[in-house]
UniProtKB/Swiss-Prot annotation:
The gene is ESF1.3. It comes from Arabidopsis thaliana (Mouse-ear cress). Maternally-contributed central cell peptide regulating suspensor development and correct auxin distribution in early developing embryos. Disulfide bonds join 41-58, 46-86, 56-82, 59-69. This is EMBRYO SURROUNDING FACTOR 1.3. Pfam families: ESF1 (PF18209).
Amino acid sequence: MKSSHTTLICIIMLSLFALHECEKMEVKEIGRSSKIILPACMHETCSGGFSLKNDCWCCLRLKTKQARCWKEKEFPNAKELCFANCPPLE
């Protein structure tokens, strides 16, 4: 048997084991594990053009972008400002 066949068989066996474990879970456990918790603020790219550098902190719960982002150049404590001004999750 080729090594690619062996690898494929291993992947299938692991998948079947994972599927079997999911089958044993109760509905309550699935509901709890499927919740996605987003932070109030995220480190994002605000500079124009193509940039991979995150240069500001933005609140995900405010409506307008001007009111919700703090650039690190203008505000050295942008992270603290964001978390202080962003409303908590309900």
